[in-house]
Amino acid sequence: MTEQVQLDENKLIAERRGKLDHIRQACKANGHPNDFRRDSLAGDLQAEFGEKTKEELEELNHVVAIAGRVMAKRGPFLLIQEVSGKIQAYAAKEVQKELKDKYQGLDIGDIIGVKGALHKSGKGDLYVNMEEYVLLTKALRPLPEKFHGLTDQEMRYRQRYVDLIVNDDSRHAFIVRSKVVAAIRNFMVDKGFMEVETPMMHVIPGGASARPFVTHHNALDVDMYLRIAPELYLKRLVVGGFERVFEINRNFRNEGLSPRHNPEFTMMEFYMAYADYNDLMDLTEEMLSTVATSVLGSDKMPYGEHTVDFGGKYARMSMLDAIKQYNPDHSEIQALTYEGVKDRDLMVSIAKSVHVEVESFWTCGQLLEEIFGETAEPKLMQPTFITEYPADISPLARRNDDNDFITDRFEFFIGGREVANGFSELNDAQDQDERFKAQVNAKESGDDEAMYYDADYITALEHGLPPTAGQGIGIDRLVMLLTNTHTIRDVILFPSMRPQA
């Protein structure tokens, strides 16, 4: 903000504070009345009366009480906005004079209540005749001049309340988000899943490979960690006999900011006993088609230059096959087998040839995943399940019966990004013990995102976890797809931001 703009804004704020002082003196009150009650919403009025003629409305003489924020003044008309939409209010000359005398006029951003008969203008727009009115809240700060297009991205995220006032697209995105979460919840309950809540603070971080946030519990005098995933607690519940559970809640990962990443984000995780990862893929297809149709009215929708189709069966291919498909001219990749993947020198050579910056502590499985991420992932625009993840990057997933180098795991991609991760759960306590120990060794070798050893979880597995499949779905990324937005900040109400200078 330039110095001149700041001075102009300060002047407007001072003027509006003066108006509020005038209102308090004139009304002998605090200037914020709380006794007006509306009985109608703009959206409902438009739906019910929008098709009626001017003459029909005059004959009806339907009196309504509305309330909302003044977004524009056009001659005698005020454009009032509230949660359901917009509607006009008409101030006759005597009313305009009263408004000036009582309130020193109304400003853009003020919140008012209006009561009067519903009419239609010569242009066919509904309006409420201002027979009774009250200024409910004086806006002391001016809105951006062009209320139809706040374009300062920093302001949009730092002052989301302003963004929601002035940007229809932002309001729509968060309405869709709310409906998506509700639709997923209803779908899961209809499928016999029980919604649960598990701890947000963990003594041992687990359930995913990520760097945690650390906090301290003063009374217990112990360090605790904001959860990176609820997985291990949810599987404890399956051990306890709750055979179908799900949770929609926040996870926290102490990582960087990007168009796809926010340190706190929303996941839906669910676990079902007596199922495998194939059942998860089938359920995911049904869920996403149902959610898209119920929220947006169609299972096909635009995303950038593409049309994403959530209907029908989704593509399924192994990670190795996907790498080959999107590197048709790379002879070493085309000749690659799982035996070759176990050759670290070969994998390092291939990774470098496709411009992957290799870390010294990466395993062969990590190298395969990085090659996939660099060359194949961005090209997966349509819903696709990528399967056969190496065991060394899947410490909680069940090994494949035919090839113990890989697991019965998939990740789900749409629009060139991962949206979900699922697998048949590892329920062999001894194998899990060994994999936890391998993760500890990896952490000691420099991998900050490797998992900790969780002895109590091993104890739970020793009591017996039935054959189980589990999955996590990133709500934020799913909403990005359903709203055709390309940065996660546009679908999180208050995203994490770097401190202002």
Swiss-Prot record:
One GO BP: lysyl-tRNA aminoacylation
Class of the enzyme per the UniProt entry, highest EC level: ligase
Comment on bound cofactor: Binds 3 Mg(2+) ions per subunit.
Keyword Thylakoid: no
The keyword Transmembrane is assigned to this record: no
Chain residues that bind Mg(2+) 2: 418
Binding site for Mg(2+) 1: 411, 418
Keywords: Aminoacyl-tRNA synthetase, ATP-binding, Cytoplasm, Ligase, Magnesium, Metal-binding, Nucleotide-binding, Protein biosynthesis
UniProt GO cellular component terms: cytosol
Cofactors: Mg(2+)
InterPro entries: Aa-tRNA-synt_II, aa-tRNA-synth_II, aa-tRNA-synth_II/BPL/LPL, Lys-tRNA-ligase_II, Lys-tRNA-ligase_II_N, Lys-tRNA-synth_II_C, NA-bd_OB-fold, NA-bd_OB_tRNA
E.C. number: 6.1.1.6
Record's subcellular location: Cytoplasm
Entry-linked Pfam families: tRNA-synt_2, tRNA_anti-codon
Catalytic activity: tRNA(Lys) + L-lysine + ATP = L-lysyl-tRNA(Lys) + AMP + diphosphate
Main location class: cytoplasm
Molecular function GO terms recorded: ATP binding; lysine-tRNA ligase activity; magnesium ion binding; tRNA binding
NCBIfam families, per database record: lysS_bact, PRK00484.1
Record's subunit section: Homodimer.
UniProt cross-references to PANTHER family, sorted A to Z: LYSINE--TRNA LIGASE, CHLOROPLASTIC_MITOCHONDRIAL (PTHR42918:SF15), LYSYL-TRNA SYNTHETASE (PTHR42918)
Family: Belongs to the class-II aminoacyl-tRNA synthetase family.
Name of protein: Lysine--tRNA ligase
Gene that produces this protein: lysS
